[in-house]
């Protein structure tokens, strides 16, 4: 086997296959600089298909969730079509990623990507679509509940001193109401100021006295903050109360939550 290879050959192989630099170099070294044999090498290793698919948009897939020993994990695994998302190999990959994360308490998605890269590449070659380990989250707590709405929406919520029935209802509420923050006080100043500037511009068209405009803007901002904060949202199971009211009645509080929706913010 050759120990070095001409960069011109690497460039040509990349141009013909779309495979990455290192994959092309390795294939050429293993095939002693023979382009055609290197192409076959890439195909056999699965690198050719995987590299060509890497930029394909993945906005289908599934949300996976699992709880074990006071640890909850949630994963969004993407593919290109709904058909592949139902493939057993795709489902097994998602489930195995969660098992690995739970057993080793892995919090870093990049670590999971490294561990499962060869498995991902192999699956890309088999199904002919790009597969993307898009996002992952781990939470810890004494009382964790997981809720999946089909495979498209997933919620993990951690609470203290809250029975499973109420915790399930709150998880379902989170799935439906899409809160972004736990409490109004958690809303970032950046998010608040961006919305404030929008409301300020909208108010200029109302032709109202400045003191009245201030009240209008303040009212809209309060509504905005409440709408994106879990504890201030009207509880979907009992809309005359807020989620905060339900928690207070049960002498409990939510420690953390995470909500994934399939394909969120993925370019179409």
Swiss-Prot record:
GO molecular function: translation elongation factor activity
Taxonomic superkingdom: Bacteria
Protein name per its UniProtKB record: Elongation factor Ts
UniProt record similarity statement: Belongs to the EF-Ts family.
Intracellular or extracellular location(s): Cytoplasm
Function in brief: Associates with the EF-Tu.GDP complex and induces the exchange of GDP to GTP. It remains bound to the aminoacyl-tRNA.EF-Tu.GTP complex up to the GTP hydrolysis stage on the ribosome.
Start and end residues of each stretch annotated as Involved in Mg(2+) ion dislocation from EF-Tu: 81-84
GO cellular component: cytoplasm
Gene coding for it: tsf
Record key words, sorted: Cytoplasm, Elongation factor, Protein biosynthesis
InterPro entries listed in its UniProt record: EF-Ts_dimer_sf (IPR036402), Transl_elong_EFTs/EF1B (IPR001816), Transl_elong_EFTs/EF1B_dimer (IPR014039), Transl_elong_Ts_CS (IPR018101), UBA-like_sf (IPR009060)
């Amino acid at each position: 086997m050759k120990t070095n290879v001409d960069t011109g050959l690497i460039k040509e192989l990349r141009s013909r296959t779309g495979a990455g630099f290192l994959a092309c170099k390795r294939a050429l070294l293993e095939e002693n600089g023979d382009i055609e044999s290197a192409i076959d090498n890439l195909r056999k290793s699965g690198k050719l298909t995987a590299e060509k698919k890497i930029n394909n948009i993945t906005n289908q897939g599934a949300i996976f969730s699992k709880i074990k020993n006071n640890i909850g994990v949630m994963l969004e695994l993407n593919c290109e079509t709904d058909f592949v998302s139902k493939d057993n190999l795709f489902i097994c990959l998602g489930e195995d990623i969660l098992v690995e994360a739970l057993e080793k308490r892995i919090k870093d998605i990049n670590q999971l990507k490294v561990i499962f890269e060869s498995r991902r590449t192999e699956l890309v070659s088999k199904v002919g679509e790009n597969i993307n380990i898009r996002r992952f989250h781990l939470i810890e707590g004494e009382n964790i509940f997981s809720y999946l709405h089909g495979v498209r929406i997933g919620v993990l919520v951690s609470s203290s001193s809250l029975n499973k029935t109420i915790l399930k209802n709150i998880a379902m509420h989170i799935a439906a109401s899409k809160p972004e923050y736990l409490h109004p006080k958690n809303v970032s100043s950046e998010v608040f100021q961006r919305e404030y500037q929008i409301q300020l511009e909208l108010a200029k068209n109302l032709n109202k006295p400045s003191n009245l405009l201030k009240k209008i803007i303040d009212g809209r901002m309060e509504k905005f903050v409440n709408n994106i904060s879990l504890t201030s949202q009207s509880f979907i199971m009992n809309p005359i109360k807020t989620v905060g009211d339900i928690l207070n009645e049960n002498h409990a509080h939510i420690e953390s939550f995470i909500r994934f929706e399939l394909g969120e913010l993925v370019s179409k």
